[in-house]
Each structure stands twice: as structure tokens, then as C-alpha cells.
């Protein structure tokens, strides 16, 4: 908001017309120069945040960390396993597991059965040129030495059936209750040793052995008895006690008042003197 100002001193007419015209000309020429001359671009310089103490040729701490990480070999991220893999893959993992068989034939894997099915093609150790040992051969096909020494036994072994000799059936031992009770009654009871009686024999009773030597170590019972004897015994005395009746409490005693002597005290202590003629002989 602009307010037009009015020069009140123009009424005095002190200013010359030449001065006003020169000032107007100078102001007009100044405005013309400003409008004719093109604007000069101003150079903006950013404030430097770097310290003068740091060497500009050396890399910054951030550049050092970036270069260090670039030089290190990139670690391979480990694939998830177990429950983590199952949780990440979800239904896809279950579908893939169901699609793939357990082994080549689709049967549950068993190392022995799998080895028997696949043969000896992928064995770690070669089996060419290997022969069973003598002990294994004799166990599987019999002992050749014993068969040659006892040909009769060998022939009998060949004629016998494959099964072993069946043992004879055992007879069942079954008894009734009456038979069992009768056997128990008939069984002889054990008889104790009979005491032989001797003639001209005297009865000897054993007594406690006498202590020939005083034992240095005391038994537990002796220690307890000695401890009981050493303890002081309590002595009880009979005392005759007499009780007297408590005297009855009297009334409140006469006490002097707080502000001066009491009336009773003044009567007893300050009684008026009795005067007689003997006290005044001059008046007789």
C-alpha cells in the first residue's frame, strides 16, 4: 500500500528551477543506464565443509570402507535348510517332494536292499580276485577233514532229514487237590537233634566275667552315668508365706492451697494468745 507524499516547502518557492531540472536529468540518465546495460551474472560459491587439516589427496573414511568391501570376495549366501526352507517354500516344497521318488525304484530306501539291487557297479572297493576264507568255506559246506576221517558219520548225516532229532514229549505231571494234601501229610516232618543225658553231670551256670584290669576306655553307659552324677542337683525348700490385708485408704489429706495457707492450718498454727491480769501487773 503506497501513500503519496506532498512537499509542503514548495509553497516557499526557495528552490531554483535550474537545480530541479538538473536533478531530474541525472535521475533520468541513471535509470536509462540501468535499463540499457545487461544484468551481470553473479558467481555463487558453495561454502566448503572440509577441514583444512585433511589432505585432499587421501580418500575419505567412507571411500575407504567402500574400497575395502569391494576388495573382499563376495560371500555366497547359504540356502535355507530344514524348517526354514519348508516355511519359505511352503506348498511348492511339498509338491516337489511328492513328485520325486525316494530312490530309483520308488521303494523306501534301505542301504542293504539298495546295494543288492544296484549290484557291484558303484562299490568303493573292487571285488575282483577275492575268494572266501577257509573258515567261511568250512562253515558253509562242512569240514572236509572230518568227513574224510569218518566216512560213516558223513554218510549218516546225509541220510538224516534236514530237521534235528525231535526230543521225546514230556509227560504232564498233574495232581488233584486230595492227592497233593495226602502227600503233604505222609511226608516225614524234620526231627530235631535229641539231647543226650549224661550221668553224674553237674550243672554249671555262667556268670558275668570279672574285670581283672580297669579299662582305660569307658563305655557309653559309664560316661552317661558319670555325667549325670557330676551335674548339680536341684534342692527344693518349703517356704511358709503369710499375706496381710492391705490397709484401707483414708480420705484426702488437708493440703495447703496453692495461693496461701489453708484455714485449718491457720487455726491450728496461729491461735490467738490468751491474756490475763498476770500478764499486765501495772494495771492491777
From Swiss-Prot:
Residues 22-36, 52-73, 119-141, 172-186, 194-209, 226-237 have a biased composition (Basic and acidic residues). Residues 1-284 are annotated as: Disordered. GO terms for biological process: regulation of cytoplasmic translational initiation in response to stress; TOR signaling. GO terms for cellular component: cytoplasm; cytosol; nucleus. It holds the Pfam family Stm1_N. Residues 263-277 have a biased composition (Polar residues). The modification Phosphothreonine is found at residues 160, 166. Its main location: cytoplasm. Ribosome preservation factor that protect a small pool of nontranslating, vacant ribosomes in cells under nutrient starvation conditions. Under nutrient-limiting conditions, cells reduce ribosome biogenesis and degrade ribosomes via autophagy (ribophagy) or proteasomal degradation. To avoid excessive degradation during starvation, STM1 binds to and protects 80S ribosomes from proteasomal degradation. Under nutrient-sufficient conditions, TORC1 phosphorylates and inhibits STM1 to prevent formation of dormant 80S ribosomes. This is Ribosome-associated protein oga1. The gene is oga1.
Amino acid at each position: 500500500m503506497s501513500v503519496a507524499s506532498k512537499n509542503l516547502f514548495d509553497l516557499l518557492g526557495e528552490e531554483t528551477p535550474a537545480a530541479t531540472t538538473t536533478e531530474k536529468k541525472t535521475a533520468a540518465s541513471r535509470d536509462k543506464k540501468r535499463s540499457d546495460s545487461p544484468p551481470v551474472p553473479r558467481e555463487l560459491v558453495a561454502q566448503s565443509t572440509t577441514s583444512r587439516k585433511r589432505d585432499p589427496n587421501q580418500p575419505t573414511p567412507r571411500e575407504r570402507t567402500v574400497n575395502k568391501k569391494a576388495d573382499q570376495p563376495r560371500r555366497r549366501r547359504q540356502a535355507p535348510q530344514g524348517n526354514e526352507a519348508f516355511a519359505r517354500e511352503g506348498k511348492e516344497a511339498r509338491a516337489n517332494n511328492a513328485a520325486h521318488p525316494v530312490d530309483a525304484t520308488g521303494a523306501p530306501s534301505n542301504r542293504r536292499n539298495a546295494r543288492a539291487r544296484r549290484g557291484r557297479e558303484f562299490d568303493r572297493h573292487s571285488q575282483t580276485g577275492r575268494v572266501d576264507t577257509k573258515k567261511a568255506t568250512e562253515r558253509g559246506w562242512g569240514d572236509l577233514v572230518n568227513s574224510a576221517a569218518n566216512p560213516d558219520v558223513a554218510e549218516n548225516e546225509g541220510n538224516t532229514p534236514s530237521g534235528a532229532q525231535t526230543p521225546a514229549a514230556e509227560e504232564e505231571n498233574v495232581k488233584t487237590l486230595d492227592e497233593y494234601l495226602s502227600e503233604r501229610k505222609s511226608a516225614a516232618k524234620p526231627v530235631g537233634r535229641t539231647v543226650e543225658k549224661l550221668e553224674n553231670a553237674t550243672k554249671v551256670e555262667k556268670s558275668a566275667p570279672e574285670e581283672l584290669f580297669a579299662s582305660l576306655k569307658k563305655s557309653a553307659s559309664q560316661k552317661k552315668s558319670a555325667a549325670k552324677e557330676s551335674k548339680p542337683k536341684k534342692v527344693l525348700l518349703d517356704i511358709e508365706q503369710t499375706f496381710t490385708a492391705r490397709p484401707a485408704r483414708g480420705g484426702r489429706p488437708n493440703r495447703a492451697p496453692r495461693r496461701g495457707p489453708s484455714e485449718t492450718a491457720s487455726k491450728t498454727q496461729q491461735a490467738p494468745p490468751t491474756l490475763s491480769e498476770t500478764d499486765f501487773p501495772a494495771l492491777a
